[in-house]
Amino acid sequence: MSELKERLLPPRPASAINLRGDAGSRPSPSGRQPLLGVDVLGLKKRGQGLKSWIRVDTSANSQVIEVDKFTMMRRCDLPARDLRLLDPLFVYPSTILGREKAIVVNLEQIRCIITADEVLLLNSLDNYVLRYVVELQQRLKASSVTEVWNQDSLELSRRRSRSLDNVLQNSSPDYLPFEFRALEVALEAACTFLDSQASELEIEAYPLLDELTSKISTLNLERARRLKSRLVALTRRVQKVRDEIEQLMDDDGDMAEMYLTEKKKRMEGSLYGDQSLPVYRTNDCFSLSAPVSPVSSPPESRRLEKSLSIVRSRHDSARSSEDATENIEELEMLLEAYFVVIDSTLNKLTSLKEYIDDTEDFINIQLDNVRNQLIQFELLLTTATFVVAIFGVVAGIFGMNFEIDFFEKPGAFKWVLAITGVCGLVVFLAFLWYYKRRRLMPL
């Protein structure tokens, strides 16, 4: 037991061992046990909790960084409970959380933090994590090439176009922001992983169930029990992913919260707007963005400035609401696509569960049939035993020790045996006729 504790617990610092030895060698004058020394620096180093993270930026560049928990919390503006979702030592259900500056994704093996500029994953040797990183880099590189091509075509169309409408129509390329592309790869990886597990379970289940219907054995029943346990666990995981996607699709506020690029642009725009200094007055007119003094300005100018500010604020709010609606529609279409995929996987597992239930019902019917046959055979044996008991009664009566003249006749034994046999046969046939009439036995 002591050896196991030494292997599990971290090694003691040398300073603590030295202090303990010194304290043990010098007893206290009051007779009390001396206080043991504590290596504060060693505790501080162990308390930092540096973890290795894989960072993927918008340019598809990846690097390994070592960051502690508190630095990561400040960097992504996340609470500690969200970081616990990413810890591989704990088992949490699938979750997608939209925060102020990040999206926390916990989908099967894919556990990452998505921001507007980067994706952070715990450094792991899991193949699914490495495949996610490679697939994300390929998607980002492909999207960057597409954006360059769209910009070139946009510049060419601007040069050739003569109207302003054509320029406005071609000035907004249709592509997903960085966080949605990273979320899409995570959803695709999770859905593909769950669908592959469901397919493997189907390949293993259907032949086993078909064999079980024809041959019921202890080995096949044990395999079917294990298969059903795996099916229930996989169905629970698929159902959780489906419910999480459906919950996001039903809540427009959560979907709007996940649009990190737009929030970052608005924040930067507000900062730039606060830092800019407007020109207040020219020679004979005033600027619309200049503050109007209530003393020096006439009432007409104040009313005009107030009406213009109201119109401008309404226009900005309407434009932001339209952008939010469009962004929600983009994310909703993305989630809806993978909702269909995960719902198809769930339907596949549901069909397999129904097939298992049908097989169980068929096996129960077979067992009931065998049980009924055994009961019928037992009833037949009981009837035959009753008929044989009649012979025992006759033998007991004639076996009594008293004088009868019937015993002295030479053909008496044959007559007794024949009459008893005929009576027993009649009784047995009467029982069979009764069983057939009551449909207790198929005869």
UniProtKB/Swiss-Prot annotation:
It is a multi-pass membrane protein. It is found in: Cell membrane. Expressed in the whole plant. The keyword Lyase does not apply. Residues 1-33 are annotated as: Disordered. The chain crosses the membrane at residues 379-399, 415-435. Its main location: membrane. GO terms for molecular function: magnesium ion transmembrane transporter activity. InterPro entries: CorA_TM1_TM2, MRS2-like. Keywords: Cell membrane, Ion transport, Magnesium, Membrane, Transmembrane, Transmembrane helix, Transport. A motif (Required for magnesium transport activity) lies at residues 399-401. The keyword Magnesium applies. High-affinity magnesium transporter that mediates the influx of magnesium. Involved in tolerance to Aluminum. Belongs to the CorA metal ion transporter (MIT) (TC 1.A.35.5) family. This is Magnesium transporter MRS2-10.
